[in-house]
């Protein structure tokens, strides 16, 4: 799309809002959907071009939902108003996902993988996620606990069980990713799991599983009889 074309010069059938009403939202690109939310561009770009620049500057949709106001405003053409529009949209989506979690019951490792695989598999650094469960193995919450190089000296059970107690969890599952794409457990992974299992016994909050996420695959330490 030429930068000389303004949004009102685009044929009406190709404008994002009109396309959504005629074809349905599922037929629009990510950039077109964001353009509808932002509504206007600026003197240099129409709103579709601006949306393209935003999404690609922050690393795609995954980056968009994790971007801060400061990071968004570093994109040319994005001021405070548009940054807050994007942040509000992202927060609404996150709240919807939290409400959706309440309907999820965990009965096998693949149920857990569905909750975290897409979120963790493409990250460039290790992230540890805690899933708190009630007495019927329904998900209470899903929380990011730690980010960075995971090892047994840095991941302290106190941080994990503090969140479990706060949410009145009956049991927990932890998940973390291997940026290499290989989910084979390391010695540190096994040590962390052992420590958490013992702490859980003392606190009456059972560690049900530890999933390691690789590139579109995962390993359950429970299934491997490590837990």
From Swiss-Prot:
SUPFAM superfamilies tied to this protein: RuvA domain 2-like
Sequence motif JAMM motif, residues: 176-189
Keyword Translocase: no
A GO MF label: metal ion binding
Domain MPN, chain residue ranges per copy: 105-227
Binding-site residues for Zn(2+), renumbered to this chain: 176, 178, 189
GO biological process: proteolysis
Record keyword Hydrolase present: yes
CDD domains: MPN_DUF2466
Sorted UniProt keywords: Hydrolase, Metal-binding, Metalloprotease, Protease, Zinc
Family (UniProt): Belongs to the UPF0758 family.
This protein's name: UPF0758 protein CPF_2399
